[in-house]
Amino acid sequence: MWNQKHDLESAQTPLYPMMSESPELRWSFIRKVYSIISIQLLVTIAVAATVVKVHSISVFFTTTTAGFALYILLILTPLIVMCPLYYYHQKHPVNYLLLGIFTVALAFAVGLTCAFTSGKVILESVILTAVVVISLTLYTFWAAKRGHDFNFLGPFLFGAVIVLMVFSFIQILFPLGKISVMIYGCLASIIFCGYIVYDTDNLIKRHSYDEYIWAAVSLYLDVINLFLSLLTLLRAVDS
């Protein structure tokens, strides 16, 4: 009985000062978003583990022309699907269908990246990602409760991602060596840590209740990009 009363009082406590909406509704929305993200991460782990374990899959992608073409398609698919996903993210069941395609395609790309990485580096990246994501999420909820706002990070993070994209393009055309890869991985990790805080703050304060798919996509991308950034950094250190 005491626990039920305590939970009810916790649910009625505002998540941030001057909160005008119902805390129960916002908490329900937050739980729904994190449930979707959890399913996405489980699908990603299952698909990526299959790609890593079944050696013939990575061999097909790296040694055949059809495999290379399919790899390019898998890389482009999440980018292509994000356009209709943004447009239909409030339209059920199309939003879930597009989300599934987006998640599976990205999971394949993650799996192929992990297929050429040592198990130790993958494990280190997974542990670091989990610790950082949980820590930053708890911090953002704590900071929001005390009136801190992280909306100002948006323009800076967007500009930083543009710099990363240009740096990646240069790296493809003119490989800059191990040190440059380490610097890239370190900077990318910091940037996506910022995005986790920024998108969690949006989840708490700004997303409408119908934007659960887009909120989940944003945080899922933050987690995956942080993992890949740490993987890049640790792989360069390990080489």
Swiss-Prot record:
Disruption phenotype: Delayed development of the powdery mildew fungus E.cruciferarum. Increased cell death upon A.alternata f.sp. lycopersici (AAL) toxin treatment.
Main location: membrane
Membrane-spanning residues: 41-61, 66-86, 96-116, 121-141, 156-176, 179-199, 213-233
Subcellular compartments: Membrane
GO cellular component, one term: membrane
Keywords: Brassinosteroid signaling pathway, Developmental protein, Membrane, Plant defense, Transmembrane, Transmembrane helix
Pfam families recorded: Bax1-I (PF01027)
Tissue specificity field: Expressed in seedlings, roots, leaves, inflorescences and flowers.
Induction: Repressed by Brz, a triazole compound that acts as a brassinosteroid (BR)-specific inhibitor.
GO biological process: brassinosteroid mediated signaling pathway; defense response; regulation of plant organ morphogenesis; unidimensional cell growth
Annotated membrane topology: Multi-pass membrane protein
Function: Regulates the brassinosteroid (BR) signaling pathway that mediates cell elongation and organ morphogenesis.
Family from the record: Belongs to the BI1 family.
Protein known as: Protein LIFEGUARD 2
Organism: Arabidopsis thaliana
